[in-house]
Amino acid sequence: MERAMEHLNVQLNRLTRSLRRARTVELPEDSETAVYTLMPMVMADQHRSVSELLLNSKFDVNYAFGRVKRSLLHIAANCGSVECLVLLLKRGANPNYQDISGCTPLHLAARNGQKKCMGRLLEYNADVNICNNEGLTAIHWLAVNGRTELLHDLVQHVTNVDVEDAMGQTALHVACQNGHKTTVQCLLDSGADINRPNVSGATPLYFACSHGQRDTAQILLLRGAKYLPDRNGVTPLDLCVQGGYGETCEILIQHHGRLFQTLIQMTQNDDIKENMLRQVLEHVSQQNDSNYQRILTSLAEVATTNGHKLLSLSSNFEVQTKSLLRIIRIFCHVFCLGPSSPNNGNDMGYNGNKTPRSQVFKPLELLWHSLDEWLVLISTELEKEITDTTRSSSGNDIASLFLKKQEVDHSVSSENPQLLLDASSVMKTPEVYADGQDVISMIANRLSAVIQAFYMCCSCQMPHGMTSPRFIEFVCKHDEVLKCFVTRNPKIIFNHFHFLLECPELMSRFMHIIKGQPFKDRCEWFYEHLLAGQPDSDMVHRPVNENDILLVHRDSLFRSSCEVVSKSSNEKLKQGIAVRFHGEEGMGQGVVREWFDILSNEIINPDYALFTQSADGTTFQPNSNSSVNPDHLNYFRFAGQILGLALYHRQLVNIYFTRSFYKHILGIPVSYQDVSSIDPEYAKNLQWILDNDISDLGLELTFSVETDVFGTMEEVPLKPGGTTIQVTQDNKEEYVQLVTELRMTRAIQPQINAFLQGFHTFIPPSLIQLFDEYELELLLSGMPEIDVMDWKRNTEYTSGYDLQEPVIQWFWEVVENLTQEERVLLLQFVTGSSRVPHGGFAFLMGGSGLQKFTVAAVPYTSNLLPTSSTCINMLKLPEYPSKDVLRDRLLVALHCGSYGYTMA
C-alpha cells in the first residue's frame, strides 16, 4: 500500500511539474521521439530544460536524425545556442561528427558566423581541417561570408590555409570572388598563396576580376599578384571587359600599363559584347583628361587601320565592315562623354579652327582623305566612261585607278602593304576587272561603309538634330558617284546610308532612288530604325505591371482610351501595350488587336465630328467644322497617337482615309485630283480649266474664292493681294494649286497639325516619308479585300484535322459563300482584327510573332458554337455532322459572339 502511494506521489509530482512547465519532464525512451522533443528546446537555447531532460535519460547525444543525419550539436551550432552546445559537449557530443553532406558543427557555426559556438567547439578539439563533401573547410565558409573577425580566431588552428575544395579553390579564391577585403588581407597575412591556381588555372586575381571586385583586385596587385590567364587563355582583363567592370579594369591597367593597348585591341573582337566594352572604356576615359585623350586617339588609330584594311579587296568585307563600324560607334560614344565645348560645326578643324578636344580625330583624317581620293578618282573614271568609245579603254583606266590608289595609300601604311589593294592581283585577273563597272561595284560597298563611319564621326560633334556642314559638303561634292553606287547596288542605301534618314537636306537627293526600292525592303528599313534601341515590344512575353495596363470601358471606349493614353508614358507605350476591358478577364495580343480595331471605328464616329465621309463613301477626311466639338484638337491629337501606336506595333486599324489626308501625313503636297474625294464636280471644273484655253472666255476669276464664314459669304484671297490678281492662261496652274490647297489643306490645317503632333510622337517624319500614300494605307490598314484562296493556303490544322477532313472541306465551302462582311467578321472572331496584313495571310501576327490561321478540332455536342483563341489565331471548330449545321453554328457565333474575351 505504501509503495502504491509512493508511486502515486511520484506520478502526481511529475504531472505537477509538467503542467507548471508546459512540457514533458521525461524524455521518451524512443530516440527518434526524444530527439524531436529536444530539438525545439536546443534551437531556443533552453539549456536548463534540456539538462533536466537529459539528467536521468539514456539518450545518446550523438544520435543522428532527419534527412541530412545531423546531431543536436549541429542544431545548436547552426542556431548559435551556445549554452546548449556546451551542455551537449559536456555530455559527450562529438564535435567532429559529419552529417550526410560532410559538414561538422564547426562548418555550420562558421557559415552562420556563430563566434561563441566556434570558440567552444575549438575548446573541445573540433578539427578545423575537416572538409565536407565539396572539399570546403570552415575557413572556406568564413571566406564566403566575409567573417574576418572569426577568421582571425580560426586561422591559428589551421594547418594549411591553402586547403582546396573539390574545384581546387582555396579560401582566398572565394574571398576575392565575393569582394571581402579584410578577409583577403587576413588570409594573405596568414600565408595564403596569392597566385595559387584552381583546377582550371584560375588565380585569386582571376576570381576577383570575374566578379568586378575592384578593391580585392587592388589588394592582390599591391601584394604582388601575377597577371595570369587560366588554362583556356582567358585573362583577368577579358573577364573585366566581358562583365563591363570598368573600375576593376582601370586597376589592372594602372598596375600593368601594357594592358591599355590590349583593351583598345579588344574593340576588334566581335566575341566581346559591344555594350560591355563601351561601359569599360566609358569608365576609364572619365577618370582624367589624359585617359580620355589617349583612349580616343588610340581608337581613332585602330579605326584608321581597319578602314584601310576594308578598302583592300583582299580583305573580308563583312568582317572588316563590322569591325570598323563597331570601333567608330565606341569612339563616338566615348567622345560624347567628354567635356562640353562650343559646337559650331568646326570642331574637327575643318576651317583650321581645331580645339584640343577635336585633336583625337586627327588620325582618322588619313582615312577620310583616302576616301575622298577614291571618290574623286572614280568620278574621273565615270566621266571618261561616258566619253570613251571602247569598253577596253575603260577597263584599263579602272585598272590604272587601282594602281594609282595603291601608290597613294602606301604612304598611309608602308609597313603593311597587305592592308591595301593588291594592284598586281587586279592585273592578273583581267577577266574580273576588265569591266570598270564590276570594279566600281566591288569597291562601292567598301567605300560606302567608310562613308557611314565618316558620317558617324561628323555627327557625334554636332548638337542633336543638326547635320555636320562638312558631311553635307562631302555628299554634295560626290553626289554623282554616290548615286552611281546606289543605282548599281540599291542595298547600299539600307546597309550604309542611314544618314539619309537623319538629314532631310540630303534625303531629297536620293528619294527617287529610295522610292524605287521594293516596298518590303523599305518596310524592313523603316522598322529597323523605328525600333532601334527598344527592347522586345511584345508585352505578352513578360510580366505586366498593373500600373501599365490600359483599362478601358467598352461603353465609352473613345473617351476612356483617350484618358488612359494621355496619362501613360510614351516610352512605355513604345515598349509594349497591355489592354484590359473593364469587367473582363482577357488580356493579350488578341485583346490589343480588338482595341485598335474598335477604337479606329470610334475615331470616325460622327458623334465626335472629327472626320467626314468622302464622296466615295469608303474613305474619311478631317472635318473642317470639327470645332463644334470643344475638344476636337485634343481628340485629333489622340487619333494621331493611336494611328502612330498602331503603326509602331504593327497593328492594323479598321479605317481608310482619303488620299489627300495620307499625303498630309507624309508631307506630300496635294494635287487638284485629290479634290474629287470631297467634291467630284468641283474637281471636274478644275480639270476643265487646265485642259482648255481660258484666254477669251471672260471668266473674270481672281486669286480668291467666296466662302461661308459663320453664315456670311466672304471673299478669301488665295495669296496676298489675290482679290485683285486675274486668273489667266499663264497663271491658271498656280490658281488651281492654290485653290486645291485652300480646300484640302488650309481649311483643315489646325486639325492636320494636331493629328500630326500625336502621330509624330511615335513615328518620326523622316521615316514615314519612305512611303507614298498608297503604301501608307497598306501599312496602316492592310489589304482591303480578303482572298479566300490565300487564306486557305496559309491555314494550319491541329487536334486531328487536316485539309482532307470533311468538316474542313465544308468549312472552306461555307467561307467561299460568305459575304465580304461575314468574312471580315470571321477574321475578327479568330484573330481580333478585321484586316489582313500587307503580304496576305502568311504575315498574320500572333502573341509570339508570325502565327498562321489555325483550325483545331473540338468534340461535337448539340448546339455547340465555334470558339477562338485570338492570341494564337486559332478557330476551335466542333466536328459538326453536316455542312448545314456547320454554317448555321458558325454564323450564330459570328453575329452574336464577335466581341468579349475570357481567359483561355
UniProtKB/Swiss-Prot annotation:
Residues 569-904 form the HECT domain. It is found in: Golgi apparatus, Golgi stack membrane; Cytoplasm; Endoplasmic reticulum. Keywords: ANK repeat, Cell cycle, Cytoplasm, Endoplasmic reticulum, Golgi apparatus, Membrane, Repeat, Transferase, Ubl conjugation pathway. It comes from the Eukaryota. CDD domains: HECTc. GO terms for molecular function: small GTPase binding; ubiquitin protein ligase activity; ubiquitin-protein transferase activity. The active site is at C871. It holds the Pfam family HECT. Disulfide bonds: none annotated. It is an enzyme of class 2 (transferase). InterPro entries: Ankyrin_rpt, Ankyrin_rpt-contain_sf, E3_ubiq-protein_ligase, HECT_dom, Hect_E3_ubiquitin_ligase. GO terms for biological process: atrioventricular valve formation; cardiac ventricle morphogenesis; Golgi organization; heart looping; membrane fusion; negative regulation of reactive oxygen species biosynthetic process; protein K48-linked ubiquitination; protein ubiquitination. Gene3D superfamilies: Ankyrin repeat-containing domain, Hect, E3 ligase catalytic domain, Hect, E3 ligase catalytic domains. Pathway: Protein modification; protein ubiquitination. It catalyses: S-ubiquitinyl-[E2 ubiquitin-conjugating enzyme]-L-cysteine + [acceptor protein]-L-lysine = [E2 ubiquitin-conjugating enzyme]-L-cysteine + N(6)-ubiquitinyl-[acceptor protein]-L-lysine. One of its GO terms (cellular component) is Golgi membrane. Its main location: Golgi. E3 ubiquitin-protein ligase involved in Golgi membrane fusion and regulation of small GTPases. Acts as a regulator of Golgi membrane dynamics during the cell cycle: recruited to Golgi membrane by Rab proteins and regulates postmitotic Golgi membrane fusion. Acts by mediating ubiquitination during mitotic Golgi disassembly, ubiquitination serving as a signal for Golgi reassembly later, after cell division. This is E3 ubiquitin-protein ligase HACE1. The gene is hace1.
